[in-house]
Amino acid sequence: MAETDPKTMQDITLVVETLLQQMQDKFQIMSDQIIGRIDDMSSRIDDLEKNIADLMTQAGVEELDPENKIPTAQKS
């Protein structure tokens, strides 16, 4: 097997390091975007839950106990 020139090894190392850094940067950007979208979705879900609770209150519907699914007025 032929020996690899030290200059060639440095070039290969540099290319691999650059490629790995680019991949890491892209994954970080994607991760940040995903986390941002999850945060947005969480805020929207919170708003939706609040709006549903407000609509239920306006309609005179009692909120259900989340553990037993029994209207809170019937709980003893």
Curated annotation (Swiss-Prot):
- What's a single GO CC term here? nucleus
InterPro entries tied to this protein: HS1-bd
GO biological process terms on file: axonal transport of mitochondrion; endodermal cell differentiation; muscle contraction
Key word Nucleus present in the record?
Answer: yes
Where located? Nucleus
Q: Keywords of this protein's UniProt record, alphabetized?
A: Nucleus
Principal cellular location given in the protein's record? nucleus
Domain of life where this protein originates = Eukaryota
- Keyword Lipid biosynthesis among UniProt keywords: no
Matching entries from Pfam families are given as: HSBP1
Q: How does it assemble?
A: Homohexamer. Associates with heptad repeats of HSF1 trimers and probably also HSF1 monomers, and with HSP70. Association with HSF1 trimers and HSP70 coincides with attenuation of heat shock response and the conversion of HSF1 trimer to monomer.
Role of this protein: Negative regulator of the heat shock response. Negatively affects HSF1 DNA-binding activity. May have a role in the suppression of the activation of the stress response during the aging process.
User: Can you say what this protein is called?
Assistant: Heat shock factor-binding protein 1
